Every structure is written in C-alpha cells, then in structure tokens.
C-alpha cells in the first residue's frame, strides 16, 4: 500500500529530483484535508455495525429470493458470510479513505472476490446492491455537518462514493 506521501517521494526519487513546489503544495493540501478524512473514518467506524446491518436488511427485503429457502444465501452460514463480507468491504473502504488510495482494498479485499462469489453460487449483483446500500448510508453519515472539521467536503464525499462504486463493480 502506497499512501499519497509515499507515491510522491517514490516518483521524485525515480527522477532523482527534489520535490517540486507543485508536489509540496499537493502534499500540503493533503495535510490540510487529513482532519476531514479522520472525521469521515471515525464516523463510518463508529456506525459500521448499523451501516452493515441496515444494508443487509434492505438487501434481504429487496431480494428475498436470494435469502429464502432454495436461494443461494438461504443457510444461516451463508447469511452470516454475507454480513461479514459487507463489513470487510466497509472496513477496506475506510482504509482507502484514510490513505486516499485503493491499493490496500484492491489487494486484500477485492481481488478474486467476484470469482469466490461465482464459485459459491452467490449472485454478485446482490452483493453489489448491498454495497450500494452501504454507500448511501455512509454518505449520509459522512455528510452530516455537525461535529466535524469545517470546510468543503464535496471532493472527499465524491472520493468516498468512488470507493464503494469500485467495490460494487468488483463483485458485480
């Protein structure tokens, strides 16, 4: 996993150059933005259980055929695995928000996940729907202006949304 700082240093080192003013300014912007990132991660972490549980309940209501007798996720172990996987994905989304980078999510969570679901007979589009439900809840929680660092968070919210979109696309 390379964070933004490591990437900039690595790129400068490959060129055998000092950091440019543009690179330093970009890193200063990241530092200024870090409190907002920490606020978002803290909120998502504090609300992780409800985000996952509510997404799962909404998914069951939306796609009962997947969870009813005869469905691919009928058995309680499969249902527990669904909840667990949604939680894993949310956790890796928070890592991505903190790092400003998807490499850890890609490497440790998403790579091979679609194939795993296919092998288990789990409909990837159902998992993607659950991820989208988590995205909606996470954005609502993260966008609440009370008790967080002031300032424009639109770019960060767009970034947060993109991490959920990436996860949903990886399993669909």
Swiss-Prot record:
Quaternary state and interactors: Heterodimer of an alpha and a beta chain.
**What is this protein's function?**
Light-harvesting photosynthetic bile pigment-protein from the phycobiliprotein complex.
Cellular compartment(s): Cellular thylakoid membrane
- Which InterPro entries does the UniProt entry name for this protein? Globin-like_sf, Phycobilisome_asu/bsu, Phycobilisome_asu/bsu_sf
Processing and modification events after translation: Contains two covalently linked bilin chromophores.
Q: Which UniProt keywords apply?
A: Antenna complex, Bile pigment, Chromophore, Electron transport, Membrane, Photosynthesis, Phycobilisome, Thylakoid, Transport
Per the UniProt record, one Pfam family is Phycobilisome
Name the chain's protein. Phycoerythrocyanin beta chain
Name the residues that bind (2R,3E)-phycocyanobilin. 82, 153
Query: Might you report a single GO cellular component term?
Result: plasma membrane-derived thylakoid membrane
Q: Which GO terms describe its biological process?
A: photosynthesis
Give the membrane topology. Peripheral membrane protein
What family is this protein classified in?
Belongs to the phycobiliprotein family.
């Amino acid at each position: 996993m390379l964070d933004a700082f490591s990437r900039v240093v690595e790129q400068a080192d490959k060129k055998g150059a000092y950091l440019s003013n543009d690179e330093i300014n970009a890193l200063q912007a990241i530092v200024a933005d870090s409190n907002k990132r920490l606020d978002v991660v803290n909120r998502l972490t504090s609300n992780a259980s409800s985000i996952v549980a509510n997404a799962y309940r909404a998914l069951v209501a939306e796609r009962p055929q997947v969870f009813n007798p005869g469905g691919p996720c009928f058995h309680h172990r499969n249902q527990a695995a669904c909840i667990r996987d949604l939680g894993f994905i949310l956790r890796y989304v928070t890592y991505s928000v903190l790092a400003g980078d998807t490499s850890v999510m890609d490497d440790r969570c998403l790579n091979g996940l679609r194939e795993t679901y296919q092998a288990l007979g789990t409909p990837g589009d159902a998992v993607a729907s659950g991820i989208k439900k988590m995205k909606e809840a996470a954005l609502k929680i993260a966008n609440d202006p009370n008790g967080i660092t002031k300032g424009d968070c639109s770019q960060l919210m767009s970034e947060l949304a993109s991490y959920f979109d990436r996860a949903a696309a990886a399993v669909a």
